[in-house]
Structures are given as C-alpha cells and as structure tokens.
C-alpha cells in the first residue's frame, strides 16, 4: 500500500521505502514481524508470484521501475562474523529508467510478463528483458488518419485488471475521446465520463464512471474504484454497474485477500475538488477498509489521521517476504551494514560452470 502524508512524505505498508528523485535514489525503511508496517514508495507496485520479486514504479522524472527480491542468507565471506540472517528480507535487485513522459501508474502481471499503464502515452506497455518499455496495447479511440496519438495524455489510462492475456484484461480511463480538456487540467469535466476498455475489442465495455482507478478481478467479478464518488463498483460484461460499497474518501487501491477486499481511500487534493463531485472533502479520510466480498459490508477500517493519499495496495505472502532491511523503531547499524555488504538472493549460484 502506498500513501502520502499531509506533509508530502509517502508511507508504504508492506513494501520498502523508496524516495523518488531525478537520480532515482533508493533507500529502505523496514518492519518487524508482528508490528504495524510503515514505509514509503511511489505509485504502482506488483508481486511476481512465481519468483517472489516485487516491482515498484516511481512516476518522477525520469520514471524508475525498481525490482526487489528476497535475500535468504549471507555470502560465505571469511571477513564476516555473522553466518546468516533471519527470515526472507526484501532487498533491491535492479532498476530500469524510463522517460518521465511514460508516466507509469498501475503495474500487473499479464501472463508471465510484467506490464504497466503508460498514462502519458495512452497505452499499456511491456518491459523487455533488455530494458526500456514496449507498447503492446492501446484503445482504438486514440487512432486517427495519422496513426495512434501517443504524444499527450488524453485519457488517463491508469488501471489494469490483469487477465491471462491482453485480450482477457480490462483497463480503466477517465474518458474515451481526444476532444476538449484533458485529465489533469482543472477544466476537465469528469462526471460520468470514465470508462472500462475491453482488452479484446479495444472499445469501452462500461461507461458512466467518474475517475475510475484500480480495476481488479475479485472472485468472478470485475471490481473498480469509482474514485470521484468514493465507491467500489462491480461491472458486468453487459455494461451494467452495481455499487458494492461506499466509503469516506477518494477510492483508489484495491486488493482481494480471501473473502475480503482491501480498499484504500484518500483525501481530496484541494485544487482537484471538481474531480470528486460525489464526495464531501471535509469528511474524507486516508485509510484502508476491509470489505466483505459477498455482502459489501465494511468489516474493519484502519485510518491515518495525518495521512493524505493512498495509491496502490498489494498483498505479499509472508512466506515469500517476511521483513525489510531496516527496523524503523530499533536501528541496528552493524546488522544492516552486514546485510548490505553480503546478502545473497535465493536464486544466486556461487559458481558458474560452462
């Protein structure tokens, strides 16, 4: 989960701390098992379940796609007194730099490959092994006589509901035309213009939403955060929209865990008040809410009184990753130095043989 406090510092539950800067600096704030996790990061993040890798997107200029991987031991160094580490510690493994205009938001595994929503290009991109990004899907509405328009953010194509293939996936956007004001501009009229695109047809399959985010397949249904009205909705293949739950805040961030869906809410940024016609800004809270998938009942909430924005939520099994490099409450410089000096990933081979 990614959140931002009123002072502008970002806090992330269950992920490492990342400060996004033009140089792409990466550092960490850890958690201790059994304690409330709190740390920080940029916007989208995604777990690659087959390998246990965590991918985190920073949307600063340049964009940076970080890869983090669990370390389960120390290298057999003769200059160390410590012989091991406790648990599976999430450590930095790589970074990929992309133009700031890519404007990465959501990340998702579609089939075996990592994909991202390149909001600045009105497209979905894949990330080839050799670096960079490659456009692999875009809605037909950006195509004209001169080809597809990847040069301006026309749609705010920000969310991915990942299926087994692009054709089986769905994507959210704030509108489906290239006319008039664009998302991000204050004069952009938002109410009822949001859509869900079908990956198969590249056309809207659902209309009437307001600044939708975080589409996810929950059980056998497609759930979407209808942010401008502070709700979570279930969208049918026939274009129908059913309200599942109403919450006190700008809904964004959605993750299913067992029989619950965890939904994030954020405060309204004052200059974007017009983007939330269905909300009362003074009543909005920054928090996480557990929604019963069958009934839509909110069974529990965790609210940060000084919080501001939540961007994304991802569940990471503790058997894959059970702690982070640093304990924010009890720092241990010697152990931290040893960990960064000689950590070993579970997939590492000490000797390469021909």
Protein language model features and the residues they cover:
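Sequence-structural signature of mature extracellular/luminal beta-sheet repeat domains
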Residues: 1-354
């Amino acid at each position: 989960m990614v959140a931002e406090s009123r002072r502008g510092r970002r806090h992330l539950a269950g992920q490492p701390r990342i400060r996004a800067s033009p140089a792409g600096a990466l550092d960490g704030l850890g958690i201790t098992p059994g304690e409330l996790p709190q740390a920080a990061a940029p916007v989208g993040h995604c777990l690659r379940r087959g390998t246990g890798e965590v991918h985190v997107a920073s949307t600063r200029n340049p964009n940076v796609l970080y890869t983090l991987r669990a370390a389960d031991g120390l290298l057999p160094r003769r200059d160390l007194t410590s012989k091991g580490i406790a648990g599976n510690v999430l450590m930095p493994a790589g970074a990929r730099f992309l133009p700031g205009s890519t404007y990465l938001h959501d990340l998702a595994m579609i089939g075996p490959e990592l994909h991202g929503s390149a909001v600045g290009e009105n497209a979905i991109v894949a990330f080839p092994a050799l670096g960079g990004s490659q456009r692999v899907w875009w809605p037909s509405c950006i195509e004209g006589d001169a080809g597809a328009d990847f040069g301006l953010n026309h749609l705010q194509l920000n969310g991915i509901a990942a299926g087994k293939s692009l054709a089986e996936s769905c994507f959210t956007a704030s509108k489906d035309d290239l006319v008039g004001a664009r998302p991000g501009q204050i004069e952009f009229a938002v109410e009822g213009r949001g859509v869900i695109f079908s990956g198969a047809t590249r056309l809207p399959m659902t209309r009437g939403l307001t600044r939708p985010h975080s589409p996810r397949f929950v059980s056998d249904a497609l759930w979407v955060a209808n942010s401008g009205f502070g709700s979570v909705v279930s969208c049918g293949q026939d274009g129908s929209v059913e309200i599942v739950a109403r919450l006190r805040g700008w809904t964004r961030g959605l993750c299913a865990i067992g029989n619950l869906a965890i939904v994030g809410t954020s405060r309204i940024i004052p200059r974007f008040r017009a983007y939330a016609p269905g909300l009362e800004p003074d009543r909005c809270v920054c928090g996480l809410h557990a929604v019963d998938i069958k009934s839509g009942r909110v069974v529990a909430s965790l609210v940060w009184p000084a919080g501001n924005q939540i961007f994304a939520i991802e569940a990471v099994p503790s058997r894959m990753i059970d702690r982070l490099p640093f304990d924010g409450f009890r720092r241990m410089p010697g152990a931290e130095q040893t960990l960064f000096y000689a950590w070993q990933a579970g997939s590492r081979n000490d000797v390469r043989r021909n």
